[in-house]
């Protein structure tokens, strides 16, 4: 099949007026920055399945998401994960001994705490009899932690699960070069002074050059930012459109923060420093200021910049999920049901960031829903260009037929229902923790706005993606 990034896009809008085709007013207009009105909808069918246990979210919390290199810079990942767990315990008052299992997602592992879920659980005071494990699936690691928990509960293996995720980008592992590592290991095995001196004689100064963490995809040798730039170009997403969307994200996040809607954030007293109470990456600017920034990846003609990309972020999240009957027996009023979910994978070269486009129709079909049934959309915003490219792909019959094997397009999420309290562009994106934030945002929005169904979706490195249906718990 002709590569997606070289073939001309048939029946896809190719001008900056694509928003008119979608019946979307300019993203920067004030009407788009107001919170959406409560969804006036009749109660729809429930998605409960016969002979399968209902899994509910009791509540979820997260530490404030901070720009890397700021207040969390002297911590370790398990410190943040422990803070999220402690915050969850305080929020829910769940007895530690009733938790059957703890699962956390993370991407960049600290060698000292490779099973960060276990170390954080012990640090937060959970019983040493409570098992814990860590999963990694790039930007959908927390999603995998949650759905693993859903499976354990639905199958009857567990009743109470804590799922979450953590990422600390302020202190990523920087290794010695491979030659230096080999030399040091060989020196450790040497049995005589002669052997040691012989090995030392092989040392060269260039052995000291550090090995920085890879930022490119292993399978393609391309950075995600570079891929986002190519994807935006393939779908004719302009720089202005990307900046407008980023401005929308920051403006809505600031509004939600000021109005106290980001209730999943719990204060965290950083040892030796002040208490952190809110996300610090929310920075509404202006299109004029954003236009001054130079391309970050493809220079000089690229359209992806620091302003329309998510930033390196430190943070952790945690959720208490239970079998419905267990939650009710303990006196809890759950926030939402976790319903159908779907994982997808596609070409990591040309479709790296199109996970939401592929996962959305599959999870809707699995749940027996349509786009019109969804009251709250929460999509991970890696880049503005990624979001807008997914919009165009989802609104294209041609793309659906030629790349997805579908007869009709997926359909476009209504912008008035989309990421109404900001997204990863503004709130931040700690790789391993974002999935829980998305689900809690959907659950909290459904309660606030009066909707019934939420759709969470995210892309991930490796050309993978995830989507999940969240159903509001009856009030």
UniProtKB/Swiss-Prot annotation:
Annotated intramembrane regions: 174-221
Positions bearing the site annotation: Increases nucleophilicity of active site Cys: 429
Active-site residues per Swiss-Prot or TrEMBL entry: 139, 459
InterPro entries xref list: Thiolase, Thiolase-like, Thiolase_acyl_enz_int_AS, Thiolase_AS, Thiolase_C, Thiolase_CS, Thiolase_N
EC number: 2.3.1.155, 2.3.1.16
Pathway assignment: Lipid metabolism; fatty acid beta-oxidation
GO molecular function, one term: acetyl-CoA C-acyltransferase activity
Organelle targeting sequence: 1-34
Enzyme class: transferase
Positions bearing N6-acetyllysine: 73, 189, 294, 299, 333, 349, 362
Reaction(s) this enzyme catalyzes, per UniProt: an acyl-CoA + acetyl-CoA = a 3-oxoacyl-CoA + CoA; butanoyl-CoA + acetyl-CoA = 3-oxohexanoyl-CoA + CoA; hexanoyl-CoA + acetyl-CoA = 3-oxooctanoyl-CoA + CoA; octanoyl-CoA + acetyl-CoA = 3-oxodecanoyl-CoA + CoA
Any one GO biological process: fatty acid beta-oxidation
Gene Ontology cellular-component annotations: endoplasmic reticulum; mitochondrial inner membrane; mitochondrial outer membrane
PROSITE patterns reported for this sequence: THIOLASE_1, THIOLASE_2, THIOLASE_3
Keyword set includes Transport: no
Subcellular compartments: Mitochondrion; Mitochondrion inner membrane; Mitochondrion outer membrane; Endoplasmic reticulum
Keyword Endoplasmic reticulum: yes
N6-succinyllysine, modified sites: 73, 189, 191, 273, 292, 294, 333
Keywords for the protein's UniProt record, in alphabetical order: Acetylation, Acyltransferase, Endoplasmic reticulum, Fatty acid metabolism, Lipid metabolism, Membrane, Mitochondrion, Mitochondrion inner membrane, Mitochondrion outer membrane, Transferase, Transit peptide
Alphabetized PANTHER family for the sequence: ACETYL-COA C-ACYLTRANSFERASE, TRIFUNCTIONAL ENZYME SUBUNIT BETA, MITOCHONDRIAL
Subunit structure: Heterotetramer of 2 alpha/HADHA and 2 beta/HADHB subunits; forms the mitochondrial trifunctional enzyme. Also purified as higher order heterooligomers including a 4 alpha/HADHA and 4 beta/HADHB heterooligomer which physiological significance remains unclear. The mitochondrial trifunctional enzyme interacts with MTLN. Interacts with RSAD2/viperin.
Biological role stated in the UniProt entry: Mitochondrial trifunctional enzyme catalyzes the last three of the four reactions of the mitochondrial beta-oxidation pathway. The mitochondrial beta-oxidation pathway is the major energy-producing process in tissues and is performed through four consecutive reactions breaking down fatty acids into acetyl-CoA. Among the enzymes involved in this pathway, the trifunctional enzyme exhibits specificity for long-chain fatty acids.
Family per similarity comment: Belongs to the thiolase-like superfamily. Thiolase family.
NCBIfam families (UniProt xref): AcCoA-C-Actrans
Protein's UniProt name: Trifunctional enzyme subunit beta, mitochondrial
Natural source organism: Macaca fascicularis
